[in-house]
């Protein structure tokens, strides 16, 4: 696929976002995700953000994909920021696999595993449940323990530990996380088949705390306690070191794009409310209005600069 295919997906998302926006008042009261929203996004081609262009997807490397991907999620945020944030997790997570083709410790096995994940990404949503209490959001500071399973499969493990900010819990088919193997120098990346798992602890996954609805109200960013929960380890232990610089860039850009979409909405809403009133505003009100416009303009300049830096990488 070339850039025209990304543009086609963007146009599809613009139409979907416009439909979402018609129900803004109702959507702002939601405390959970609607699966039908994500069915529309999948039909629009958004899942292909997790597939390389040479395999019929949209990923053309960070330099060529950064602008298109951020445009997609910013567009979605115009219609529903919660849906946009959860959808953002799919490409943000898949870059861990898309961004690393060659490793030294298990080159052929990694290529096979990487390809299997890419195939899953065509039709399944990916998310993340990596943050832990006390980690400050640093996935490398995990205290979760990984234990080898008894089935003899090299990548088969169970994990035990506390995780939170699992955005899209109950929606995502698969989630990545980090955990530490006994004796290993650092943590490894694992992925969990999480869709439709009970949250009562019967299979090792217990809902510790449901998302409290603060901020992004309907993202289902729940907290969990895992106890000997099945997990698949990435076959290479080099992955986090190799790909983290790329994932940090694209992840931060995507999340910033959601915030910029919210800012777009706020500015548009304010402009509509102030139509016909600007000439009668008091001096203080005019100063505050111009300050708001300037702050959003400055945010846009910073965002544009970050995208250009990614394109030049």
Say what each PLM segment does:
Residues 124, 140-142, 171-173, 186, ...:
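A generic structural signal for well-ordered coil/turn residues at beta-strand boundaries
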Residues 7-21, 25-42, 51-55:
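Structured, charged N-terminal subsegments at the starts of enzyme catalytic cores
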Residues 12, 16-19, 262-269, 295, ...:
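Amphipathic, well-ordered alpha-helical segments in soluble domains
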Residues 130-132, 148, 163, 178-181, ...:
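Short, structured patches in soluble enzyme cores that scaffold and shape functional sites
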Residues 156, 162-204:
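A short core secondary-structure module
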Residues 35, 39-42, 49-162, 167:
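Glycine-rich flavin
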Residues 25-29, 300-313:
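C-terminal helix-coil-helix/basic helical segment that borders enzyme active sites and/or dimer interfaces
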Residues 210-297:
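Glycine-rich beta->alpha junctions and the first turn(s) of the following alpha-helix
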């Amino acid at each position: 696929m070339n850039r025209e295919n990304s543009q086609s997906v963007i146009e599809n998302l613009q139409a979907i976002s416009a439909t979402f926006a018609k129900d803004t008042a109702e959507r702002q009261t939601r405390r959970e995700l609607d699966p039908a929203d994500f069915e529309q996004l999948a039909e629009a081609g958004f899942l292909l953000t997790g597939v390389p262009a040479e395999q019929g997807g949209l990923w053309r490397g960070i330099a060529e994909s950064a602008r298109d991907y951020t445009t997609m999620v910013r567009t979605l945020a115009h219609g529903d920021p919660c849906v946009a944030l959860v959808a953002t997790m799919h490409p943000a997570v898949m870059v861990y696999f898309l961004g690393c083709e060659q490793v030294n410790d298990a080159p052929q096995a990694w290529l096979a595993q990487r390809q299997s994940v890419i195939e899953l990404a065509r039709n399944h949503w990916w998310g993340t449940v990596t943050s832990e209490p006390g980690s400050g959001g640093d996935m490398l500071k995990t205290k979760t323990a990984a234990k080898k399973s008894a089935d003899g499969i090299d990548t088969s493990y169970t994990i035990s530990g506390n995780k939170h900010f699992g955005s899209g819990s109950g929606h995502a088919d698969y989630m990545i996380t980090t955990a530490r193997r006994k004796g290993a120098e650092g943590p490894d990346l694992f992925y969990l088949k999480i869709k439709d798992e009970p949250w009562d602890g019967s299979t090792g996954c217990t809902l510790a705390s449901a998302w409290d609805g603060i901020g992004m109200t309907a993202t289902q960013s729940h907290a969990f306690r895992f106890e000997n929960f099945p997990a698949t380890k990435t076959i290479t232990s080099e992955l986090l070191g190799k790909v983290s610089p790329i994932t940090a860039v694209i992840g931060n850009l995507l999340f910033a794009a959601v915030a910029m979409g919210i800012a777009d909405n706020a500015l548009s809403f304010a402009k509509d409310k102030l139509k016909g009133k600007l000439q009668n505003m008091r001096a203080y009100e005019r100063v505050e209005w111009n300050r708001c416009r300037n702050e959003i303009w400055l945010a846009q300049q910073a965002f544009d600069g970050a995208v250009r830096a990614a394109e030049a990488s």
